């Protein structure tokens, strides 16, 4: 549970989480349940593997607060039933966020590119092979075809997060196909 203000936090490449719980609650790449907290300038590259029923999000599991200038580029594998969203499992307000999370599960898993539940989003996008539904009552235009298409959104995403203290820059490193945009302090 988080009611905190989380800024500039990250979970990097070599972290893996294996879930064998009872299907209650929610798990996320950074926060399991965000209860009226704020998450800004954060990212997760975590791999989550769930062997039992799960509700999971690439960055946040259950979300009731604002998430701004943040992204998820990990992987969620659901081997039982449940709901998985590339960015959040459900809820809250998302501004200037993206997900390139690899999402997979059994036939009894609901998989959505951004969120499986109701969510409010502004300038949020996802890129995931085999997943076409953004979820959360969001338009299908939130799906981008590749890293170049996401990079084309950088100006509008930065405009949406202006004043947050963070901005996106293009990633020119070797992992740019998976993480096309990096978040950094806006100084």
Model-derived features: where do they sit?
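Predominantly extracellular beta-rich ligand-binding scaffolds that present long acidic/polar faces
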Residues: 1-187
């Amino acid at each position: 549970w988080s009611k905190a203000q989380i800024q500039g936090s990250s979970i990097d490449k070599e972290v893996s989480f294996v879930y064998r719980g009872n299907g209650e609650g929610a798990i996320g790449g950074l926060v399991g349940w965000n209860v009226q907290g704020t998450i800004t300038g954060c990212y997760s590259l975590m791999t989550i593997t769930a062997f039992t029923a799960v509700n999971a999000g690439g960055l946040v599991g259950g979300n009731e607060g604002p998430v701004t200038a943040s992204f998820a580029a990990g992987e969620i594998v659901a081997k039982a039933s449940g709901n998985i969203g590339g960015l959040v499992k459900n809820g809250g307000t998302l501004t200037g966020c993206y997900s390139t999370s690899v999402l997979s599960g059994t036939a009894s898993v609901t998989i959505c590119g951004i969120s499986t539940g109701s969510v409010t989003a502004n300038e949020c996008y996802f890129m995931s092979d085999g997943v076409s539904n953004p979820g959360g009552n969001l338009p299908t235009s939130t799906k981008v075809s590749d890293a170049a298409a996401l990079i084309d959104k950088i100006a509008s995403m930065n405009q949406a997060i202006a004043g947050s203290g963070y901005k996106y820059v293009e990633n020119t490193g070797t992992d740019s196909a998976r993480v096309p945009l990096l978040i950094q302090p806006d100084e």
